[in-house]
Amino acid sequence: MRRKKEGLAMNFESNKLLSLYLKKLIPIGMGSCGECFLNPKTNQVFKIFNQFFEEEEGFPYEDEYAEYDEKEILRFANIKAPSFIFANNIITVNGHIVGYISKYANAKRLNQINPLIISLEKLKRAILEVYNSLQIVSNEGIKTYDMMYNILYHNKFYIIDQDEYSYNDMDNKKLYNYNRANFDQEIYYFLIEAYLDEFISQDARLKEMFGNREVDVLTFISELQSKLSERVQKPVSKLSDAKHVLNKQKVKKPFYVRDLF
């Protein structure tokens, strides 16, 4: 048998069989912990840990994969938070965990999207949906981490790769504010860096609000729209409506790395 499912595990009898299976899938991205492949027939993403690819012959399973625990990987599988895509299955070779499976979202990473052309109203509605999901995960005691480049968008947000999330005994309200600020920071990077830094630095109110963890990014975007509309003397529904106020100087080494082309 080439592969079989055992409970919540998809088990392959050898590393060779898993490698052959992956060749039938579509590579869709790499991260610090592993590589992802899409199975278009099942609409699933297979994330395979880096150790799998680093071994040319056989795997020192006990040494390399001992850190991976099924309960740990699937600890959020039953939490219903629509903006989050959690692991729902594990992948094993001879019973040793080498990756996990999650559902696929037909969306792009934020850093692959041109922020000038998206509808700000749709963006705000999508942010509100994330806030609702963040309330759910915060009530479960989950502390988010490493959201950069792990947020997808296509009229709504999908947050992926929760490998480094953890349970925390912080008060729910404080935890929500912490998690919300983590998400907000990525939206600030996406919308502002290398595009509107100069405009914001010249406006006292926006400068005060920008990146302030006590002010949510939803409120900031509404204020930004108002200020931009005032400057260009017309409603601003997307940032390209205010092209002439964009940065005059190109940012040489932006912190937020975009992949637009």
Task: Tell what function each PLM region has.
Residues 44, 83, 100, 158-161, ...:
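Protein kinase-like catalytic core scaffold
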Residues 53, 109, 167-169:
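Conserved protein kinase catalytic core
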Residues 1-26, 64-68:
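Juxta-kinase regulatory segment immediately upstream of eukaryotic protein kinase catalytic domains
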Residues 41, 96-98, 155:
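Conserved catalytic motifs of the protein kinase core domain
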Residues 154-261:
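C-lobe/activation-segment region of protein kinase-like
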Residues 80-127:
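Conserved structural core of kinase catalytic domains
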Residues 113-152, 157:
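Conserved kinase catalytic-core helix
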Residues 21-90, 113-114:
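ATP-binding glycine-rich loop module of kinase domains
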